[in-house]
Curated annotation (Swiss-Prot):
This is Large ribosomal subunit protein uL23c. Binds to 23S rRNA. Part of the 50S ribosomal subunit. It comes from the Eukaryota. NCBIfam families: PRK05738.2-4. It comes from Oltmannsiellopsis viridis. One of its GO terms (biological process) is translation. InterPro entries: Nucleotide-bd_a/b_plait_sf, Ribosomal_uL23-like, Ribosomal_uL23/eL15/eS24_sf. The gene is rpl23. GO terms for cellular component: chloroplast; ribonucleoprotein complex; ribosome. It is found in: Plastid, Chloroplast.
Length: 90
């Protein structure tokens, strides 16, 4: 099940959001918001209050003369209760 949550995202924006108890992950494209909430609550033992998702546009990549695209992904911003935290980001 945790294979569906690919990895945590560490960027300037995600570091700012950690102060507001919002954590950022890249997840499988097929997951829905209720499934993401269930996965995060079950794996990290926290209470999720909100789940925001977005799918950034795909980016072109050149390999020699051929033009390809980077794989698509879904980015999730999960808000948890104020008195809790996720230890991965600590």
């Amino acid at each position: 099940m945790i294979d569906l949550v690919k990895y945590p995202v560490i960027t300037e924006k995600s570091c700012r959001l950690i102060e507001k108890n919002q954590y950022t992950f890249d997840v499988d494209l097929r997951l829905t918001k209720p499934q993401i909430k269930e996965l995060i609550e079950g794996f990290f033992d926290v209470n999720v209050t909100a789940v925001n998702t977005h799918r950034p546009p795909r980016k072109k990549r050149r390999m020699g003369l051929r033009v390809g695209y980077k794989p698509r992904y879904k980015r999730v911003i999960v808000t948890i209760k104020a008195d809790q935290s996720i230890p991965i980001f600590a």
